[in-house]
Amino acid sequence: MSDGSVDLHCHTTASDGTFTPGELVEEARRRGLAAIAVTDHDSVSGIDEATAKGAEIDVEVVPGLELSTDVDNGEVHILGYFIDPEDRGLLGLLESQRESRLERARKMLDRLSDLGVQLS
């Protein structure tokens, strides 16, 4: 039973959370929450699963996002609520961010290899 509380900043395994999207909604219900916002870091991939589970067990799921942005030599995270997880512009931006992160990781691995660090 819900006590009317909400949590508007939840992460799933689609970013750095512990629970899958469905498990997160189940945990929200177990804790008596009426609604949650799924706001994964730079990902909307968990929203459909969470929304479906929410409809099934009567927990409102707000589709959201925690968007990483670079500002003045630092990073700022912007929370967005009631987003369209199928918006082509948004999906293109998220894909571009993902590709940039993968390229950065490859360069780090190359540098470590150049330094003689054994990686498996």
Place the predicted regions along the sequence by residue.
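Extended substrate/RNA-proximal surfaces in nucleic-acid metabolism proteins
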Residues: 56-120
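An N-terminally biased module of ancient metal coordination in phosphate/nucleic-acid-related enzymes
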Residues: 1-74
